Amino acid sequence: MKTKLLFFLCSLLLVSCQDDEKFQVLRPLGGQVISGYQPCTSLDLGILSLEALEVKDGGDWTVVSSDEAVVKAEKVIPEGASYSYLSVYPLKQGKAVVTVSSEKGDKIYIPVTVGTSVRTLDVWSGELNHIEGVSKEDSLLIVEHLYDDVFLRKGGYYRLTYSEKKKGKLTVCTPDGKMEEGTFVCDYEYYDLTFDGKNIHYMVMYSETGFQEVTRTEYRIPFYLVEDVTDRYRADYPTIKLVQRAQKVRLAAND
């Protein structure tokens, strides 16, 4: 009886070890700190996503995407490194299949669906103003006018639903719950927001006392949206040089 039990346990251990050495594509679990891995059998990604997957026991493996207009898949070997990983990068909404082939000829097929991505810009502070070229008294008048003209104050948010890499649907919510719908176009250095008959061009300004880093969960440190409204005041204040207003925001991922 003891001999049979020992043989059974040894068999389980052997099967387990063989399974560990199986050709697999693994997806990291967790956020900034990886807590483990699980086999990757399919991917549902937002248009802004980027996946780095581990290929285990594939030898000199290769990868190909069935539709490179939808998903780019490539083997990445960091400079000076002795390891590689699989990068899956969505380019537009749609579906594709990523095929990973081991050195021995085994294949793993990973269906990939690419949809929208959602990001929220939460307003963290009241408006900050920078005015040059007028007297202190005139500056106070301009600040008062700017305050009355602000649409979004602390506690409000801009919700960005990306249908493409740099554009999509905009939802604006004020602290008292007023909602506006519109569209946006953006890049690393700006946001162009169109809603309620308005078109606002925000420049992006990062804090000098910090750094901007995208993590696996894509939470970022606060930064500023800066709007240049100098032209509004040139007629009334001929000497004016600059009028800028800024809002401190934080960007968070919702998908």
What is each of the regions a protein language model found here?
Residues F8-L9, S82:
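Residues at the start of alpha-helices and the adjacent loop-to-helix junctions
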Residues Q18-D255:
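Extracytoplasmic soluble-region selector
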Residues K2-F8:
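Sec-dependent signal peptide recognition
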Residues L13-S16:
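C-terminal motif of bacterial Sec signal peptides marking the signal peptidase cleavage site
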